[in-house]
Structure formats: C-alpha cells, structure tokens
Amino acid sequence: MANLADGKLELLTDRNSVLVLVDYQSAMFKSVASGDKTIIKHAAIFAAKAASILGVPVVLSSINPKSLGEFIPEITRLFPGQEVFARTMPSFDAFEDERTWNAVRKTGRKKLVISGLWTSMCFAYTALHGLKEGLEAYGLIDAAGDSTPDAHKYGVERMLQAGVIPITLESLVSEWMHDWGNPKAGELVKEVYSKYGAMIGLQ
C-alpha cells in the first residue's frame, strides 16, 4: 500500500516547485550529440517559459561563461534583471556554489525540477546534491543532453537509481497547469504546448 505521506505522490504545482536550469551555454550545446539539439534546447526554453507564465521561481546557473559563453538569451530574457549565477567555484555541481544553493533554499520549495548540460555531469551531480539536501528531485530529461547517447543514457540511469524522478516537458507543464480551469491555460497552450508540439511533429 502506498504511503500517503510520501511527497512523491503529490503532483508538481506552481506553488511547490522551483525550476533549476544548469549550463545552457553555447559551447555546451556544441558538444551535445545524444539527441536533437534543437528539441533539447527548446524543451529547456519552454520549461522556462511555462515557469514564467505561472510564476514558478527559476534559478539559472552557468560555468565559466568567459570561455563557454553566456547563458542562452532565449531563457534569460524571460526573467529580466534576474542574475545568472556564474559559479565562482568551477564545480560540475551547481549547488556547490553558495549563491546558487541559497537562491534555491530561499524559495522554500521542496520539489526541485532540474535539467542541464551535460546529463551525466552538471545535471546529475546537481540533482544528486539536491537529494542529499532533502529535496525531491524531478529530472527534466528531454531538456538534457550529453556528448554521446550512452553518456546521456547512463547519466539518467544513475539519477533514477539514486531517486530522481524522471519527467518530460509536456508532463511537467500539465502538472503545473493541473487542469483546463487554470486561468493561464490559454496562454500555456499558445506559448508552450502549440509551439513545442509543432516542433516535435504533433501538428
């Protein structure tokens, strides 16, 4: 019988989640070879867009932007004036950067929705750190990529074995929206579902 006190049985909402996106930078994308770069990139963009529509707090982290490029503007422009935390400690784990971790902690949200580049490194290590801190981690898998298909596959498997819950863009947005009575439903359909659906061939 399911433990009804288990937070994992509670759906993601715009009130219990924080979205963390790690290292969506130009040089990182160049090395992605585990899937369609355009779809991976836009899954992250549309997750950020949905968060901006629904008011879900978002934390952005980058590594060595002078060499690897700035965080992609398609996401940063959704959050004007918000700082991208360029890690002062060049760690693969974004939460080893105190400012990044404090930004997440201060939201008070227990459900960590996270994705990043690359899957097996910065995404995985940060997600595992979130678990160690007592958060429930939800890995946005279709917004992640790695240098090879195997690197992505086994990075995902490592996270799942540790307790990260896999999720896709469409399931994430649907959970956040909850039902068609949501006053933001029309905007989500126009700005997220329809555009992403057309990109992946649903329309």
Task: Locate the predicted segments by residue.
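Short beta-strand segments at enzyme active-site cores
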Residues: L21-V22, P57-I63
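Short acidic, Gly/Ser-rich segments with clustered Asp/Glu that frequently serve as metal-coordination loops
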Residues: S26-S31
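Short, solvent-exposed loop/turn segments at secondary-structure boundaries
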Residues: V32-G35, I63, A151
